[in-house]
Amino acid sequence: MRKYELTDETIEFDGYITLYRIRALKDFGDVKAGDLGGFIEHEDNLSHENDCWIYNDAKAYLFANIYDSTKVFDNAQVAYSAEIFGNAKIYNNVKIYRGHIFGSVEIYGNVVIDNDSRIYGDTKIYDNSEACKRTMTAQNGDSSAKDDIPF
């Protein structure tokens, strides 16, 4: 059974992509039937299984896939074939482009994850960090822009 539908509310993004606001069709996790979510390009962007959800004005588009119990909030963007699994939580102005996120990862601030980077385990990435060019961050990592961890 489908857990959400696309509404008639749309935005044009990057000048050529139409994104649709989503509306929950049933209760699941902390989402109630009728709640409005963020924006997606196609239903393939957000799984109808489990408790994953896109909140606020967050966006998923261009072959992004969000699964399991992942939660994407605020103005975060997931795009360009990015995949997020597990109990990940993505906040603020994070951009995940072509990245792969697994597990109980938390990413917030103005972080950019790009170019096939893989972030997994109980990792937190925040502030103005960047993970690019096939970066791999393993379990129990903690990184911010004020650290000298090379991303």
Label each PLM-derived region with a short phrase.
Residues 1-51, 122, 141-151:
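Terminal amphipathic alpha-helical/low-complexity segments used for targeting or macromolecular assembly
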